């Protein structure tokens, strides 16, 4: 029952959005089609194409270089290439605006050095669709890098040896052998990056790029058009569910069998001279542009800022962020335990369906989840308030939608898949014989969970708590839409200050978010270094 309750909670936003869109009437969707729908669709589609190509090129190229070749500092780059994953794309957007915008250090230096006026030269506009795509590529390519690297490591060395023996040069062998074998894993990584792209709100909103994500927020808040927001959410939901199906299909194909045991593996290709330094540049560029330069820019802005991170106001933002993140992380992991244990104890179609439904939330953008939860619970609040007024002459107000608990539910729906993945990864260590031994001693399912599973799963569960905690700290669209009045977090404060062009003030909360985001990246780096 608990497992299905969790699954139904994940399904509720999608059903509510669909119902609200269908009951919104045709006038709203006709108006959207005549005005902004085409622009939203075109910008979202173009962003998907650019991010897909960018993450593929950077992620696959870097993975092949560090796996199949040897050059100076290759071990360092194996780990360093993961670090940009700690940066939310909207934080990178703030940093690069301070560097590349008209008053930024790059253009200011150009004008001072060359004696140019503002109209004497052309400079690429960072606040554009191309700029937004670049920010997303820099923080999302590690998805492709990690999966492609794992695939290259798992491939049989004999296939590469055979290709080389038949006269193929290393580059040709990569294109004809390594790349096709890694295609399912690479496709899964690109699709994960695309899911994050369509869910992004902070970057595209700050750069003024109109997508479905920004359209939902504008319709809900600026125009008060709930039906329009729901219909836009359905469009975005269709994108997301299609990607979820594709990602699941690709992940299902990404299975490899090592037939090379006992065979000779092709030694890594040693690069020398110009080739070696080109490899260093190609692997170093994503790290420099995705982590080092933004971090230096944020630290410089923070140093110039008059904001005091230890003031009562900022401590309140920190407290709000920590309360939301820790509460959501614990409850999400508890829900993952309930669902994962149900799937183990009751294998079958019912448990498999519950698990599939629960995982859909990761593919659904935060803005869609927010609208999908606010619509039914706002109706419930209004109905309850009307009944209490009529019966007891007492107003209950926004009992549910005005609390942090509905926001926590949104986080649970959004990040349950991540917690389930960590839980199931640890569950492979719990052998079926342990369950049988527990039953033979007269222990029931709950006792087996408490005394057998949980002690073994503790490291995986702590990892799940950490992953969800950090994801909640970085989540922006759901928090912006659903937070109670005057209940701001670090992400909201950073977005608000950056939107007001107060980048120095936005730097401090952004640095805290990045520092917290480094925690799971450190765990990933340890795994990369170990394997």
Protein language model annotation of sequence segments:
Residues 12-15, 19-22, 57-62, 91, ...:
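Membrane-embedded alpha-helices of multi-pass transport/permease systems
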Residues 201-241, 272-276, 301-316, 472-473, ...:
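Interhelical loop and adjacent transmembrane-helix boundary motif
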Residues 53, 83, 87, 91, ...:
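Transmembrane alpha-helices
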Residues 73-74, 142, 146-160, 164, ...:
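C-terminal transmembrane helix and the adjacent membrane-cytosol boundary/short C-terminal tail
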Residues 1-16, 75-81, 237-244, 267-297, ...:
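N-terminal signal-anchor/first transmembrane alpha helix
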Residues 26-27, 35-38, 73-76, 93-136, ...:
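Membrane-interfacial helix termini and adjacent extracytoplasmic/periplasmic loops
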Residues 17-53, 68-69, 74, 118-126, ...:
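Periplasmic/extracellular loop-to-transmembrane helix junction in inner-membrane transport proteins
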Residues 16, 50-82, 94, 98, ...:
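Transmembrane-helix boundary motif in ABC transporter permease subunits
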């Amino acid at each position: 029952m608990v497992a299905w309750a969790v699954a139904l909670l994940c399904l509720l936003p999608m059903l509510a959005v669909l119902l609200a869109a269908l009951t919104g009437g045709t006038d709203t969707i006709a108006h959207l089609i005549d005005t902004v729908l085409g622009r939203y669709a075109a910008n979202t589609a173009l962003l998907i194409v650019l991010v897909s190509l960018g993450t593929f090129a950077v992620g696959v190229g870097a993975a092949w270089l560090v796996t199949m070749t040897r050059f100076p500092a290759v071990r360092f780059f194996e780990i360093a290439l993961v670090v940009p994953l700690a940066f939310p794309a909207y934080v990178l957007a703030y940093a690069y605006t301070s560097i590349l915008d008209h008053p930024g250090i790059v253009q200011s230096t150009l004008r001072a050095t060359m004696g140019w006026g503002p109209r004497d030269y052309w400079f690429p506009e960072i606040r554009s669709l191309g700029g937004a795509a670049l920010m997303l590529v820099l923080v999302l390519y590690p998805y492709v890098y990690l999966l492609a690297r794992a695939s290259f490591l798992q491939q049989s060395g004999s296939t590469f040896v055979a290709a080389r023996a038949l006269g193929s040069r290393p580059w040709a062998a990569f294109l004809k052998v390594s790349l096709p074998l890694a295609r399912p894993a690479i496709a899964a990584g690109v699709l994960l990056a695309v899911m994050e792209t369509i869910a992004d709100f902070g970057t595209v909103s700050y750069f003024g790029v109109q997508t479905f994500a920004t359209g939902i927020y504008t319709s809900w808040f600026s125009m008060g058009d709930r039906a329009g927001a729901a219909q836009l959410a359905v469009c975005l939901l269709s994108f997301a569910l299609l990607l979820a199906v594709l990602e699941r299909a690709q992940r299902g194909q990404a299975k490899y069998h090592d037939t090379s045991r006992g065979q000779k593996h092709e030694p890594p290709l040693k690069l020398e001279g110009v080739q070696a330094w080109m490899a260093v540049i190609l692997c170093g560029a994503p790290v420099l542009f995705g982590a080092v330069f933004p971090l230096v820019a944020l630290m410089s802005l923070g140093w110039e800022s008059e904001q005091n991170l230890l003031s009562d106001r900022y401590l309140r933002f920190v407290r709000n962020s920590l309360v939301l993140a820790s509460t959501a992380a614990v409850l999400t992991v508890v829900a993952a335990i309930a669902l994962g244990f149900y799937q183990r104890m009751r294998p079958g179609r019912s448990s498999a369906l519950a698990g599939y439904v629960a995982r859909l939330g990761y593919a659904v953008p935060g803005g869609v989840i927010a609208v999908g939860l606010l619509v039914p619970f706002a109706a419930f609040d209004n109905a309850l308030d009307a009944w209490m007024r009529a019966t007891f002459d007492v107003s209950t107000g926004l009992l549910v939608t005005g609390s942090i608990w509905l926001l926590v539910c949104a986080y649970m729906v959004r990040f349950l898949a991540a917690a389930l993945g960590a839980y199931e990864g640890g569950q492979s260590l719990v052998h079926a014989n342990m369950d049988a031994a527990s039953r033979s001693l007269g222990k029931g399912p709950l006792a087996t969970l408490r005394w057998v599973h949980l002690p073994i799963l503790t490291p995986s569960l702590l990892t799940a708590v950490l992953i969800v905690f950090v994801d909640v700290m970085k989540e922006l669209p759901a928090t912006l839409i659903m937070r109670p009045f005057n209940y701001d977090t670090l992400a909201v404060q950073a977005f608000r200050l950056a939107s007001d062009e107060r980048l120095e003030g936005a730097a401090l909360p952004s640095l805290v978010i990045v520092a917290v985001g480094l925690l799971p990246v450190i765990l990933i780096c340890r795994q990369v270094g170990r394997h």
